[in-house]
Amino acid sequence: LSRMSETELNFKDVLENAKKLGYAESNPRSDLNGDDAKSKIQILSSLAFNSFINKSKITVEGIQNIDQVDITNAKILGYRIKHLAIAELKKNKLIQRVHPCMINQDSYIGNINGVLNAVIIEGKPIGKFTIQGEGAGPGPTTSALVSDTCSILRGNIKLPFSIPNKNRKKIRSIDVSEEFFSSYIRLDVVDKTGVLSSITKTLSKNKISVKRLIQNPFKSKKFASIIIISHRAKNSNLVKSISELANKKFVINKPKFFRIESI
């Protein structure tokens, strides 16, 4: 995603270059569809909350369908698109999610680029702190393998969780349907009277308030791209709205939708 933002190359070309440099697997499916990030956030959740690895009710979305147009739009709006894995403990219930987000371009996470990874930890009374380092390439991979191998040879059988399973807790998981997010929505539509009215009616019916709306014409004057930034709304209502809008006859391409995070 960083490379797409820097070069304006398409996803396919950037992926092929990443393979050649050793930053992506020869079969990068798990990196692209979010499975690799899903496994990582499950392990980190277990470590952070002293719980068993919880595989249920986790939202997972990959990066394979991100278009250059949305990366460009994000820049114009003051955002960057980042693939985040997030775990939160709310009222003793675990929420885990993996998906692309729009992040303020001036934020710390908004400036984690290239092969750098970052982990943000927030709690009481420690507040918030960040760990940053390279997450791909020969050096980081070799270092991790050698470290784990040496620990095993030294007889450290508690890896990777440090404490026995019997001392871990079971924490109930909930999905993100009841969580609230601001969002970016892009709709490619037939440019005709009544389209904007139909879009806003659908959003209003699902209790979604429009914060900002931009209409960009296509080269062909018959079509236009509608960009909507919403106020915070329930995730289930956002998803329902996208589904309903996708079925409108005036929508010519699959709608694009990104949650907006303030981290």
Task: Please name every model-derived segment.
Residues N17, G22-S26, I86-E88, L94-V190, ...:
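Catalytic, metal-anchored helix/loop core of enzyme active sites in primary metabolism
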Residues R3-S5, L9-N111, L116-A118:
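Substrate-binding/catalytic subdomain of NAD(P)-dependent oxidoreductase enzymes
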Residues L15, K19, I66, I71-I81, ...:
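Short secondary-structure transition/capping segments
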